[in-house]
Design a protein with these regions (language model features):
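Active-site cofactor/substrate anionic-group-binding motifs, chiefly glycine-
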Residues: 75-85
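Conserved active-site beta-strand-loop modules that form the wall/rim of enzyme catalytic pockets
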Residues: 111, 161, 191-194
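Glycine-rich phosphate-binding P-loop
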Residues: 146-166, 170-171, 196
């Protein structure tokens, strides 16, 4: 990269000014199956006893689909916060308190180590008792509790279901859009769960939310440029978790994001003939954030 190119990048991607406004993205990513899913959910809502809304503890605001509030109407709802093992618990706890003050029950879970899963079953037992006590009063037979599981793509819905079932019931992968249709799954003799594809709102016109979703793989990487995502991650880490990123890549003095990228390139062996392989650097930054090598983080702040 010659000096002209570096100056151009510096002009476009200054990271010294943390208040710099992000490029307006106005992302339109609303595949046909998402609109279809919303219609099908509305059709089946009367069958549902409780809604499990799944969000990512690292982005507890950005990963919450605001359209779900309208979709589920007055149904009983539990907010299940996954990836609690990867978040900055001090700041995520503020979000837990925020949602609980709005009257929403929150259950933070670690799906890797299966922590707090019993709390989910405790809730379903309470719903089961309430449901079937009422049915008995009306002279009706007992029936299974029916749960609707909702959330944006790639927040851990499939992993959660497999954990509840105790075996592999759904496909799991670290990319959005794996589940493509509604499917009833039997959890045990008392619980049935309706799994749904991840659904976003029609237009992501909030820059910070869009970048948070892209950073944590809730939207496909093709939607936002990897350079843009990587630079957003660097700027956010330098602002919120400076020690973590400095220690990870042995960063010393730097004047702008290009110098940070060059230092990271040297650290990971992505420099050849004095030229940094920026695509490799971007890829490593995204990987390090998503796999926890940059430490425990929460990008949404109250």
């Amino acid at each position: 990269m010659d000096m002209y190119q570096k100056r151009k990048i510096r002009a476009e991607k200054k990271n010294n000014n943390q208040e710099e406004k992000l490029t307006k993205v106005g992302i339109n990513w609303y595949p046909g199956h998402m609109a279809k899913t919303k219609r099908e959910i509305s059709e089946k809502l009367d069958l549902i006893d409780v809604v499990f809304e799944v969000i990512d503890a690292r982005i507890p605001y950005s990963s919450k689909n605001k359209d779900i509030d309208k979709m589920i109407k007055n149904k009983k709802r539990v907010l299940i916060m996954t990836k609690i093992d990867m978040c900055d618990i001090i700041n995520t706890n503020k979000w837990i308190k925020y949602y609980e003050e709005k009257g929403i029950k929150v259950i933070p879970v670690d799906l890797i180590n299966k922590k707090n899963i019993s709390e989910i079953f405790k809730v379903t037992e309470e719903v089961n008792k309430e449901l079937n006590d009422k049915r008995k009063e009306k002279g009706l037979k007992e029936r299974k509790v029916r749960i609707l599981i909702l959330g944006i793509p790639n927040v851990g819905k499939s992993t959660l279901i497999n954990t509840l079932v105790g075996k592999k019931a759904t496909n799991v992968g670290n990319r959005p859009g794996i589940t493509r249709h509604l499917e009833w799954i039997r959890i045990n003799k008392d619980i049935e769960l309706l799994d749904t594809p991840g659904i976003l709102w029609p237009k992501l016109d909030d820059d910070t939310i869009a970048h948070n979703l892209a950073a944590m793989t809730a939207i496909k990487e093709e939607i936002l440029d990897t350079e843009d995502i990587a630079i957003y991650i660097i700027n956010t880490m330098l602002k919120l978790y400076k020690d973590s990123i400095v220690n990870r890549y042995n960063l010393t003095s730097y004047n702008d994001v290009v110098e940070v990228l060059d230092m990271i390139g040297k650290k990971i062996g992505a420099v050849r003939n004095n030229e940094t392989d920026y695509e490799k650097v971007y890829s490593i930054i995204l990987r390090d954030l998503r796999e926890g090598y940059l430490g425990k983080v929460t990008f949404d702040r109250l």
